[in-house]
């Protein structure tokens, strides 16, 4: 079984468990405990933040990613660590935060996103979305955008885009091939991610961005994803995109604030 297929199959099972447990109710209680004004934070927009950031700095979506299938454990963190890391990322100049909420393969959690929601910055809920229920959760916990992966949702992606819009959420629609870009565009995607990592093999090729970006109309927002470890690599990706999503290299850094700042400065 390919890595993506395995993750998606597991996520479908987990979502059914989440539904039965009515986790939204528990998450609401957690939000109340932290006294976070989720309603106020819902007004933040990823697309607007990227456009504004481009005028003065490199627009970087920094990712809180504890582990991954390709690297294993990246950084062991608790909720207090998440808050501190998010703060360092914001102080470093991040345009938005991406929070992993997939629990088994990335060691993420919805509570990580809620803790990071304290900050006035757009938040992308990064997960393998396979069910509308996950979009309900994203809306409840204060996410501003969700990740939709074309290779897992395929032609159904239009329905998920529509449902997210109904819940006042933007979508980062992830692609890795010409066919997937066609599907994303046909579905009406406005923010399109180009993943330099092949989710079937986990191999990275930064030239994927260069090959695919010209296929995306200029009125769309393009985001380069995966494989960015140096400023040189970032500059290469940003030649073809409007923003970049960076996770592992920041999470591995001993000084997250300075690492983000290094990427952000033009």
Curated annotation (Swiss-Prot):
GO terms for biological process: L-tryptophan biosynthetic process. Coiled coil: none annotated. It is an enzyme of class 4 (lyase). GO terms for molecular function: indole-3-glycerol-phosphate synthase activity; phosphoribosylanthranilate isomerase activity. Transmembrane segments: none annotated. It holds the Pfam family IGPS. Pathway: Amino-acid biosynthesis; L-tryptophan biosynthesis; L-tryptophan from chorismate: step 4/5. Its EC number is 4.1.1.48. It catalyses: 1-(2-carboxyphenylamino)-1-deoxy-D-ribulose 5-phosphate + H(+) = (1S,2R)-1-C-(indol-3-yl)glycerol 3-phosphate + CO2 + H2O. It comes from the Archaea. Keywords: Amino-acid biosynthesis, Aromatic amino acid biosynthesis, Decarboxylase, Lyase, Tryptophan biosynthesis. Belongs to the TrpC family. This is Indole-3-glycerol phosphate synthase. It comes from Methanocaldococcus jannaschii (strain ATCC 43067 / DSM 2661 / JAL-1 / JCM 10045 / NBRC 100440) (Methanococcus jannaschii).
């Amino acid at each position: 079984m390919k890595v993506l297929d395995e993750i998606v199959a597991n996520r479908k099972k987990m979502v059914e468990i989440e539904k039965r447990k009515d986790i939204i109710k528990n998450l609401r209680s957690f939000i109340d405990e932290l006294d976070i004004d989720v309603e106020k934070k819902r007004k933040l927009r990823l697309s607007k933040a990227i456009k504004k950031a481009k005028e003065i700095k490199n627009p970087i979506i920094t990712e809180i990613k504890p582990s991954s299938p390709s690297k294993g454990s990246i950084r062991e963190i608790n909720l207090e660590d998440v808050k501190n890391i998010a703060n360092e990322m914001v102080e470093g100049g991040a345009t938005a935060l991406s929070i992993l909420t997939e629990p088994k393969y990335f060691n993420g959690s919805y509570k990580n996103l809620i803790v990071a929601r304290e900050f006035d910055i757009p938040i992308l809920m990064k997960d393998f979305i396979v069910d509308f229920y996950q979009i309900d959760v994203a809306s409840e916990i204060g996410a501003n955008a969700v990740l939709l992966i074309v290779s897992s949702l395929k032609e159904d992606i239009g329905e998920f885009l529509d449902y997210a819009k109904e819940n006042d959420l933007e979508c980062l629609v992830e692609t890795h091939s010409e066919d997937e870009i066609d599907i994303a565009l046909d579905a009406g995607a406005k923010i399109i991610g180009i993943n330099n990592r092949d989710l079937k093999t986990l191999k990275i090729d930064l030239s994927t961005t260069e090959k695919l970006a010209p296929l995306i109309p200029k009125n769309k927002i393009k985001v380069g994803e995966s494989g960015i470890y140096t400023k040189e690599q970032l500059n290469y990706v940003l030649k073809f995109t409007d923003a970049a999503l960076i996770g592992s290299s920041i999470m591995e850094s001993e000084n997250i604030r300075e690492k983000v700042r290094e990427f952000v400065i033009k």
